[in-house]
Amino acid sequence: MEKYISFYKDITGFVPYDYQIKVAELLLSGKNVILSVPTGAGKTWASMMPFLYAKQNEKIDFPQKMIYSLPLRTLANSIYSDINTALDKENIKSLYPKLSKLMSIQTGEYSDDPYFEKEIIFSTIDQTLSNFLCFPLPLSQRQANINAGSLVGSYLVFDEFHLLDPKLSMATSLGMIRLLKNLCRVCIMTATLTDDYIQFIKNELGFEVISINDFPKDVEKINSLRPANDKSIKKSVSVCSDKKINSTDILETHKDKTIVICNRVETAQNLYLELEKVKEKDTTLLCIHSRYFDSDRKKQEQLIKEYFGKSNKKHNAILIATQVIEAGMDISCDIMHTEISPINSFLQRAGRCARFENEYGDIFVYDVLDLTEKEIINIEADKNEDKNEIRKLKNRYLPYDEKLCEKSLTELSKYNSLDENISNELVNTVLRDEENKKIGNVVANLFNMDKIRQSWNDCNKSRYRETIRDIQSIEIVLIDLENNHDTKVFPWKYETVSVYKWSFIGWAKRIEENKIDPEDWIFSKAEQGNESQFDDDWKDKDSYFLRKLAVEDLKNHFEIIFVDNRYFDYTKAGLMVFPNDNSIISPIKEETKKDKLVVTYKKDTFYQHNKALLNCFEMEFKLNLKFVLNELESYWGEAVDWEKLIKLTICLHDYGKLNATWQMPMKEFQKRKTGVDNPTEVLAHTDYDDITDRDLAKECKIKSKPPHAGIGAMQAYEILYDKYSEDVAKVICNAILKHHSHETQSFFDFNIPDYCIQIIKQLFEEYTLKGEFIKAEKGESLQDIVPTKDKEWIIYLFIVRILRLCDQKATESFEKYYIL
């Protein structure tokens, strides 16, 4: 590993610890790893470096794509920024040019790689799992199956795994890993899972366990774990169980850097407003939680790094926050005040205190006292599910489990300091029974694999709450509703603030009772006009109109609610319910400020289009598929020439366009647009400009041409059923059938002229493919030819992704890919 150690030092400036070398040895030898290491001990680089090393050295026995998943957007943003900064240094780019421009980030606020195409993708767990489950959060329903295949053949890293919901995202992640088997490499990282849960993952999934406890020499070397030079301990802990978190204690104990962590946004906001009045003038006060617009939160994150980050040079600051900073953010303080939370969550918070070398910190832990009358929300609900949600609002430890918080506080009060051994004892004492129950639930629910299969089949975003995260939130848009009842709106263009639905309804009831004017429109929902051409998602060009909503209407969950900005305030403390005349409105998203591209197509023939796709596959995909293509024989159970099958899929994906009734309106349009009549030309696309050609397209009945995907799917099935097997035939059939939409289930009547058949024969001959072609057939359903085995689903998702992306790229950049 000498070469690896040298590479590691070049990138980071440090010689790797022994445990970091062991991680690389295992991953690069084909093993999957669960890594149990405390915060601040270098686990991020431990997981990153094997991929970078394999990439730089062109190792074909390691995945060529890495997907790094985190539970919170804040964490993804922070780690992406840190890694990007390290790899963007001039000396690194000069030494290792293959590591340049590899990265992207895909979260709810950043969406620069919606199809997961970069080599290294930092993502929230919601984005990663929604892709695999075929309801990708940022994409339309028609594109539901385009991203699942990105995880096939990838190196999957799950950071802060303990923060995932055990019944939902955690179980679904484990189920996904079981389904992918050897078609991926995996590194799961955790600081606070119990020993029992770690052993469960090891036994069920065949992982290798690496624990910092097995590397005592590393513990001695890791400066962030050692006490400051003049101290015998790293962190002191004081439990203040008889009082709630308060501004007086915060100011009295403040030295240079103080972090305050509250369980609820309201508590954080109230503390911020109190401290703003009484703090010293030269003390900088910062606040971060979930109720900020994305653009403002990004600014806050940057400021937090400047004051609390590793290389900070600014001093005298107090940060008020919620759990959004409790993991992943590389920040530190000398004083921390925190409300109690379950011990695994608390230890994550404590990881932001005295995090760096030669630091000492004091941590003050507070119980959460009874809710004030203002915080108690009385709402009636009809559904049992809703009643349970409302009952949660009465829990003073919300959003956490009451018994776990109480037990954590009791056990924590037995100690006056924190180190690795104490942390492990606390985790195992407080969480063992609870996590053993969770293990039982995961096994009983078969790792959510049945739900995964259902989701592949229907691609329904409603499955989010049963597979990833059971969050009932409403996205709030602040607008001038008083003067804009009849204005057209575009719901997708605004930055929003996310609020828990039942908290919002509690606010709404109080607002409704204290209206400025009985006729006010306080709450509205965007609805499309009857004349709309709306297709699939919010990003349709057509506008929406507002419909007034009553408080009762809010119980039915809507994605976006427009609210009257006179009843809400938005300040440095974030969104609050407070009548004002500030006229604050939601900002426009940065991406929507850009001019929208006009839809255009350039004419290409059937032959040219397929050649462009095949060249696109060679140029953009083939080199990065070496790992997965090598692993497929073991996964599938027999040797199959999948590369040849991908080429056959491409050649037949538009076979239905050879249909005479498909060609007729296309040729008529092209003839009338250009004045050139070429009756034997076989088209894939015509020249088209959305601004000038809409009327001509209607006259030529372009939209009335029959769907084409099903015809190619049927043809592929007939060719492959005998030559390979029914399993292979179903995989390729469905990839073609669903290459425009997962909802396609049949093919229409078709009749293909002989001169068109000659074109497909030419393609088959050029790529040494064989098959007899069906010229005419009556349409029928293909619903019975669907994947029934997990391996069929996985390979279908892998191939349909390649097909769809090649189709997009070859259509958008025809000149680039059409090479004879």
Predicted segments with their positions:
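Interdomain hinge/linker at the junction between the two RecA-like core domains of SF2 helicases
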Residues: 193-254
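Post-DEXD/H (motif II) to motif III coupling segment of the RecA-like Helicase ATP-binding lobe
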Residues: 143-218
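Conserved pre-motif I regulatory segment
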Residues: 1-36
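Walker A/P-loop
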Residues: 30-50
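Divalent metal-dependent catalytic cores for phosphoryl transfer on phosphate-bearing substrates
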Residues: 397-415, 419, 634-820
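Conserved Walker A/P-loop ATP-binding site and its immediately adjacent core
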Residues: 44-45, 62-87, 193-197, 265
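C-terminal helicase lobe and adjacent C-terminal extensions/tails of nucleic-acid helicase motors
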Residues: 270, 277-283, 288-301, 341-580, ...
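Inter-Walker segment of RecA-like/P-loop motor cores
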Residues: 87-138
